[in-house]
Amino acid sequence: MAAKGNREKIKLVSTAETGHFYTTTKNKRNMPEKMEIKKFDPVVRKHVIYKEAKIK
């Protein structure tokens, strides 16, 4: 069997308080800090900052 990878599933939550989120993976070894990325929020129809949150 293959070895378990370093990538962990994360959720990117919109800072516009719309409840919209994206899911993605991230390599914990290369990026130990919390991820912040600007992406499109279709609820407000603007690009806003998305912050990392844990998937429950």
Curated annotation (Swiss-Prot):
The keyword Ribosomal protein applies. GO terms for biological process: translation. One of its GO terms (cellular component) is cytosolic large ribosomal subunit. One of its GO terms (molecular function) is structural constituent of ribosome. Keywords: Ribonucleoprotein, Ribosomal protein. It comes from the Bacteria. It holds the Pfam family Ribosomal_L33. InterPro entries: Ribosomal_bL33, Ribosomal_bL33_CS, Ribosomal_bL33_sf, Ribosomal_zn-bd. PROSITE patterns: RIBOSOMAL_L33 (PS00582). Disulfide bonds: none annotated. Belongs to the bacterial ribosomal protein bL33 family. This is Large ribosomal subunit protein bL33. The gene is rpmG.
